[in-house]
Amino acid sequence: MECSLQKQLFNNGDKLFSSRHNRRVSIEQVHVTDSLSVNSINLFHKPICYPISSIITSRKSKSHFSVCATRRRRVHSNSDTYVLLEAGQDEQFVTEDELKAKLRGWLENWPVNSLPPDLARFDDLDEAVDFLVKAVCELEIDGEVGSVQWYQVRLE
């Protein structure tokens, strides 16, 4: 199988919004032309290597090749706001301290004498509440109370 590779380098003048410095985007595009049999698959059909992960889409017009970029998402940023869902009540927006106070109240007034095994392993009730806030999003309460759910949200 013979392949002829053609390498093109597009040096674009668009500035990326996600960077603090004025960087230019260079896109390397490799075209592969070959004579493949009918049963084979061409895995190298116009691959484009984007050097930056924030590029969403590209547009090609008559005279130039432009790249559109977005800001970097703040996926790992923490928020202090939670949505609290209690059985029989509307959703409430609460802060982390208010959520911890509510959960502490539920654990102090637990219907059964001992806490569930995953919460009973903690020495202090505050450690159990911290574990619930950071690692769990639902507390199943024994009896007819039901469950309490909370989700971390970011308000804009």
Swiss-Prot record:
Location of this chain's protein in the cell: Plastid, Chloroplast stroma
Tree of life domain: Eukaryota
InterPro entries assigned to the protein according to its UniProt record, in alphabetical order: CRR7, CRR7-like_sf
One cellular-component annotation, GO: chloroplast
Transit peptide, residue positions per record: 1-68
GO biological process entries: NAD(P)H dehydrogenase complex assembly
Phenotype when the gene is knocked out: Impaired chloroplastic NAD(P)H dehydrogenase (NDH) activity, probably due to a reduced stability of the NDH complex.
Main location: plastid
Pfam families: CRR7
Keyword field: Chaperone, Chloroplast, Plastid, Transit peptide
Claim: Cytoplasm is one of the keywords in the record: no
UniProt function note: Required for both formation and activity of the chloroplast NAD(P)H dehydrogenase (NDH) complex of the photosynthetic electron transport chain. May function in assembly or stabilization of the NDH complex. Required for the accumulation of NDH subcomplex A, which is a core part of NDH. May be involved in post-translational steps during the biogenesis of subcomplex A.
Name the record gives this protein: Protein CHLORORESPIRATORY REDUCTION 7, chloroplastic
